[in-house]
Amino acid sequence: MLIDPRDSLLSSYDYELPEACIAQRPLEPRHAARLLMVEPEAGCRDRQVWDLLEELEPGDLLVVNDTRVLRARLQVRRAGGGLGELLVLQPQGQGQWLCLARPAKRLRPGDSIALVADGEPDLPLQVLAVEESSGGRLIQFPPECVDAASLEPLLLRYGVMPLPPYIHQQDESDNARYQTCFASKPGAVAAPTAGLHLSEELLAALTQKGIERASVTLHVGLGTFRPVETEDLSQLELHSEWVEVSEALVQAVAACRKRGGRVIAVGTTSVRSLEGVAALHGGVLQPFRGPVNLVIQPGFRFAVVQGLLTNFHLPKSSLLLLVSALIGRERLLQLYQHAITAGYRFYSYGDAMWIPPECSRQP
């Protein structure tokens, strides 16, 4: 496949988005969000997410990400009395966790801090080290907090949902609304946002029509939301995220192909999971548990995914690169301009785009 040299430059993935286009609250019901349906060759249709029911066919397989978002944003008080914030990312063993810290320069190795409850310092923690590649801090939590499941009771007491910084209001409803209906495995620090559109009613209607569903797990972290800063994308590296592909999912994909169905990814995290694991095994999907850091950008050959339901992504993000790999950078940016003009809502609580297999640029 020939690659336009501009596809390898980060600046080629920039676009101007009016602040009014950034969704601040989700729509109700979930499936009421707008859906930009991409047409083959050229053009698009403005519909709603519920209309995805008309686009999918009996025998198709929807692959969703079943990760559950942790209440991973914690307020801390420093020894000098000032407040700070931690975003809990990944376990490092023995109750030690990699966290993003703010203000980072005020949290130094050896510092004692305390989690805040009801405005007062409560549970003591220790800053152990600086993690150079992410700029994060290694924090000592209670030693029993070795994984997301054992840390979650602490987060439920002290933490809040880690909404993105472009969402300026937050309340108790986010605890349910910033989770998918199928979230089951704790570990993410951001939602797999395309899945937020799939209501229980829509999922039931899809099942009744004969559309299958299977789950993959990718615990969304730095690899998804960290800004890309490398202009030369041939040098781009992403942080690893933990992925699990089960034997049941591998069998579901194989059965879908055998019956002539289409493998449809719900969200870019599902794409990264499926393609990342396949890439580790010569293009063949196999059961897997472990870190994945695959970069998907124009020129990438998809081995598993044929169609995609996705949200509208930030300029110059790795997610924009991924979607461009499927339908082409220039066409994607044209579709984004249509969405802006037509008043679509962008980012995590925003609207969605449907890219059917016949719109893929894959050979």
UniProtKB/Swiss-Prot annotation:
GO terms for cellular component: cytoplasm. Its EC number is 2.4.99.17. This is S-adenosylmethionine:tRNA ribosyltransferase-isomerase. The gene is queA. Signal peptide: none annotated. It comes from Synechococcus sp. (strain RCC307). SUPFAM superfamilies: QueA-like. GO terms for molecular function: S-adenosylmethionine:tRNA ribosyltransferase-isomerase activity. Belongs to the QueA family.
